[in-house]
Amino acid sequence: MAVREPGAWKLDGLEPCSASTIALCLAEATIGPTAHTWTPPAWLLPHQRPAAQRIAGTLPIFGGALLADAVGLGKTYVALAVGTRYARVVAVVPAALRAQWRRTAERLGLQIDVVSHEGLSRGRDIPGADLVIVDEAHHFRNRGTQRYDRLARGAASAHVLLVTATPVVNRGADLVAILRLFLPDHGLAAVGVRSLEQTVASRDYIILAEGAAVLTVARTSGSLPFAGQRPPRPVDLDLGRPPPLGARQLVSLLARIDRLRFTGFSGPGAVSLLRAHLLHRLASSVEALRLTLRRHLAYADRAVTAAQSGMQLSRSTSRRLFGAGDDLQLVIPFVAPAAIDHDLETALVAERARLLDLLQFLPKRGHRNPKAVRLAQVIHSRSQLRVIVFTAAVSTAIDLAFRWGWRRTAVVGAGRARIASGPISVDDALDRFAPNARHSRHPSRAGDVMTLIATDLVSEGLDLQDAVVVVHYDLPWTPVRLAQRVGRVARLGSTHRNAHVFWFRPPAPLEQRLHMERRIAMKAVTQMEILVPETSRVGTARKLNTLLELREHLSLMCAEHARSDGSGGPRSDDAVRIAVVCGPPMLAAAVRWTWNGHSVPQLVVLAGRPPRAVHDVRSIFRIIRRLFANSASRRAPPATLMRALWHTCRDRLTEWGQGPTDSATRRLQRRVLARGLAASRQHNLQLLTPLDDVLDHLGSGQPTGMERELDRILDAKPSPGSLAAWCGRCRPRVGPADVQFDGILVGDGTIGELPGEAFENLHSAQHSIH
């Protein structure tokens, strides 16, 4: 319905206008800060330029940003384009992607330092930088690791650009961990997240997602216009549940695994984790299980020797149970050697006997394998297409290659590669498999690789879009891996319209024990709640996040209304533009938060009786669409809605001004006050002044890295110089925040809510922040 102009009413401070005039303000408020005056490099594709402008507009305000576009849309190029605005750029990337990042930067004429995740884990420092780009940033979700600590402290003074299509892997705390690399705990208080830590602890994921959206670009291919060919569309093909050995043998083997006691381990849930690890290996192949059982046997031998000699085993001993790149590396902190004593020796000897019996029961290499036979049929039927087969274990990959004689096949895993003639480098193997995507020389037919069997080493970030077929031979532990695997093929630069995705499901006896499909489905639901643009479930390669798509479509819808009558000029004086329409008592406001010269637009929507802030994107989309559909009204805006808008904004400003309230900040403040009290008793005036400055900076809020640096200083004997240096590294103190209203679209209350549109009983997480 066309929007008619309102009558000639006017209230103090309000300037009546049409809904289409307000629409442009709402569109800008939906997508957040944007560097409109910056022209991105010409080598970006049309759909990448708005992303670069949004990231460039966000970094100076929050000290960081999250680029979470779906896999295959060219996040590397967007990040490098933003890097052209900085003098010193460091990219922190997985080791497998270092060469690709360097090649891409060189091809674009850019100078960057590249540091690997693994290098940080080994204690390497980050070079001085103005911008730190963290590729596959979800690998830094564990705050207890050395790599997280190195990154947090090394990037504390720089702008941080997080690049990942999966900012949430298992739970909402994953997102908060990486955001705290550049945000203080209250860094999103003005936009509705009073405390990052408290919000995720209370599982208010809708509120967390709405607040984090102002510094996030997370789009799917479904919400973007493409000038050229779109990334291939995944086509799912289910291969069923063939077992890795005969059905009767499988049942007998499972019975023997059930008898294992995993003697010699401690830690919460250690036995369950280790049993799941063995079952997961069996789901892959007998060869993978054989290798893991040999590791368990070696561990038992060491434990028996330790018991006989009165020694204890180190934690590193238990790490040898897991292969390089094993997903269960994530849970190694929960699996540790038990205290070894003579009473344990008898139990260890019995466990060793059970392991030997299990190893002797396993069929020999080359045994009947229905799962491998089914895979061979798939590859043979597509012999002219390049195929990537993802397995959970290198031993499985090698076994499969041997089964079909290494015909034009390469195996990649654990940082190594092999073809029929012997070992080669990983880069060489990938170049042979995907010469077009990797801009390498085409090999001779004899050296060409048509089938790549790989672990998830190659599932992240690599350009392998010469391939058109992906086979999930084994299921990983998280949907993240599934989406990343498909992303090697379904990405920009592919000449294929479709990507064929084949699924092997675990045999029924194993699925009943592992619940792999259910685990993946549950984690996918969590991802969809918080800023993950698309994910996978077993049997569905691409499941789009309709909430994030709605956010992009909401901005487009508002922009279309703004263009419908050519409105959208500057407002007169400081008046607030308002459009009142006939409709339910609902309100959508484009507000602008300002502090330290920065400006952050945000969309605030109120509805219900009494009016409350609405956080769910689906409800917001429905409200705004309903308001746009109604004709203009001559009535004044409902006073209850206007008061509710003001109170909502006032409460957020109050919470912003209160500063951080997280336990880490409070603890540091107590430590600094204790140091100050001691310095006062000693009449140490030289130390009191910098301690006072430190308290001021803590009151403004600091990211995790600066908090940890201060802890180290306080652990030692702090000097005026060390405290002053810490203050010098802190970002400028945050001044008081203010709010202005760019435009308000409101229903006058003359039309009641339709059945199903009652917003009084929204999702429990949809409430105003008080």
Language model segments and positions:
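Signature of the SF2 helicase/ATPase Hel1-core->accessory helical subdomain module
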Residues: 81-84, 130-201, 459, 469-484, ...
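Conserved RecA-like P-loop NTPase helicase motor core
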Residues: 141, 406-511
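SF2 helicase/translocase NTPase motor core
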Residues: 19-47, 53, 63, 74-148, ...
